A protein has these predicted regions:
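Extended alpha-helical, oligomerization-prone segments that build pores/tubes and scaffolds
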Residues: 1-517
Length: 517
């Protein structure tokens, strides 16, 4: 089988990317946007003059579950441990455990990464992180004055040291010492005079003024959160390992691409991939995307350095070399130009869902079963408030022929006077309105119990157990235990999927790239 031609490879890649984007838009975008809006307390506005109250069930559920999940997964000495296969592996496993945990929690902002990762999973069905090796350069420039040959040699022996400026002159101390010797020659004994003459015949010692620039290259592992709405994967993939396409659609400025070392001509020509339609569904409303969502009109002489281009940055498994075996390749591509196409050991993403669906990588978000309850509770709260308002300020029938002063009637001051010319019984009558406040409260309580049954997040394991005094100690303990088990189950799923994959990925990256401590 012949090696894939570039056009064939691009056709396969573009087709898989388009399929993955379409699959996400069709199956997940609407739910994700709905969940984020519910989490932020956004709801349809009621008619003017009616209650605009919103129930925050999704927010309460997510924020109640998050601290416990963080504590379960991140509070120990080690987030994860590597187990030795045999006795000869014990030392390596111990070192790998210590170092990879150090990479996650110390070299990277581990707590913030896990906080975002878990919250993404609870809200968006899937949380995604990406681990990769990157090299950074630290350039330092120092000036040295009056250093010797030996000192200069030692400075230049440092890795990546470069002399920018250099000048030399006689060492003033050596010049002064020689003058002192010449003045004392007449009083020296023959042996001392012979040594002094020999010294005076040598060249004057030189000293140097130099400016040295040192460039230190240091590589390390980075772990970044990936916005779920930007993440794309082979449709219907059952696991991360089973996917043939894994990546993200992200925005890079042309300046960023040039700094990353991509071909300048390709950077000039590259055009954007069409982004997933639900990019605005993120918690931050993807403010940065909106700020760049303009129709730039750059001419050939204009500065296009800040223009944002949406590119696919990810991995595809394909038989590129024609040997009959599909291999992973890392690709960075716009809609018309490929910036990177290189062989890779595997992809660098790790993903997890809090509630698994059999035979599917992307499961159910904790927010999914709560959103309908929030919609119902919002309606109940509004009816409760509207009912109280109508009870305290009922509508009134007015006999317009009874001489009632309407201005007095509409002025709802406490102790106010309403003037009229006929008895009140014949002039005014309240319109009967059924008070549904009690029924609305019962509906809200029913919704709360349904939310607890669906999520396992109860008022007892949230610390909101004011009426637990009316329960038996055994009954409350059973409720708390059931809720804790649901959270422990979610934590176990996250540990067995995304976290385990992340630590395996980090060990592979460190083993491949780390050349010094």
């Amino acid at each position: 089988m012949a090696k894939l031609h570039e056009d064939q490879f691009h056709k396969i890649l573009d087709g898989q990317i388009e399929e993955a984007i379409s699959w996400q838009e069709e199956h997940y975008s609407r739910d994700r946007k709905r969940n984020y809006e519910a989490y932020l307390g956004q709801a349809d506005a009621a008619p003017a003059g009616r209650s605009q109250a919103v129930s925050w069930d999704v927010f309460e559920t997510i924020e109640a579950a998050l601290p416990d999940l963080i504590e379960i997964l991140c509070s120990g000495d080690h987030i994860a441990e590597f187990e030795p296969v045999g006795e000869e592996d014990e030392q390596f496993a111990e070192q790998a455990t210590d170092y990879i945990n150090y990479v996650v929690m110390k070299q990277n902002p581990g707590f913030l990464i896990f906080n975002t990762w878990i919250k993404d999973a609870l809200l968006s069905k899937i949380g995604v992180v990406r681990a990769y090796w990157a090299t950074s350069e630290k350039v330092t420039t120092k000036e040295y004055t009056g250093i010797s040959d030996d000192d200069l040699t030692q400075l230049l022996s440092a890795e990546d040291a470069e002399v920018i400026e250099q000048s030399q002159q006689d060492d003033e101390r050596d010049v002064a010492q020689r003058a002192h010797m010449r003045a004392a020659l007449n009083v020296m004994d023959p042996m001392q005079r012979q040594l002094a003459d020999a010294y005076l015949q040598t060249p004057v010692r030189q000293v140097y003024d130099v400016t040295i620039r040192t460039t230190r290259k240091r590589g390390r592992v980075y772990v970044d959160n990936v916005q779920p709405e930007n993440f794309i994967i082979t449709p219907r993939a059952k696991t991360m390992a089973a996917a043939d396409l894994v990546g993200e659609i992200k925005s890079l400025s042309r300046s960023d691409m040039r700094e990353l070392g991509y071909d300048k001509e390709k950077v000039r020509e590259i055009q954007s991939f069409e982004a997933p339609q639900d990019r605005s569904a993120g918690i931050a409303q993807t403010a940065t995307d909106e700020s760049h969502d303009h129709n730039y009109d750059f001419d050939s002489e204009g500065d296009d350095a800040t223009e944002e281009v949406r590119v696919f940055d990810g991995f595809i498994r394909v038989d590129y070399d024609g040997d009959g075996i599909a291999e992973w390749r890392r690709v960075v591509r716009g809609s018309n130009v490929t910036l990177v196409n290189e062989e890779a050991e595997g992809h660098d993403f790790a993903a997890m869902s809090p509630i698994l669906i059999p035979h599917s990588l992307i499961g159910i978000a904790l927010a999914d079963p709560v959103v309908p309850i929030q919609t119902s509770s919002t309606a109940m709260q509004r009816q409760y408030i509207d009912s109280l308002m109508l009870a305290n300020n009922p509508r009134t029938y007015v006999n317009t022929t009874a001489g009632v002063n309407l201005n007095d009637l509409l002025d709802n001051r406490i102790g106010g006077i309403v003037r009229g010319t006929q008895p009140m019984q014949t002039a005014l009558a309240p319109l009967l309105t059924h008070n549904v406040a009690d029924s609305a409260l019962q509906g809200i309580e029913f919704n709360d119990s349904k939310r607890e049954a669906r999520t396992g997040i109860t008022r007892y394991n949230q610390g909101l157990d004011a009426d637990s005094l009316n329960k038996t100690a055994t009954g409350v303990a059973k409720i708390m235990t059931a809720g804790d088990r649901r959270k422990l189950m979610m934590a176990r799923i996250m540990a067995e999927t995304g976290i385990k994959d992340l630590f395996r990925l980090l060990l592979r990256i460190v083993t491949e790239n780390q050349d010094k401590p």
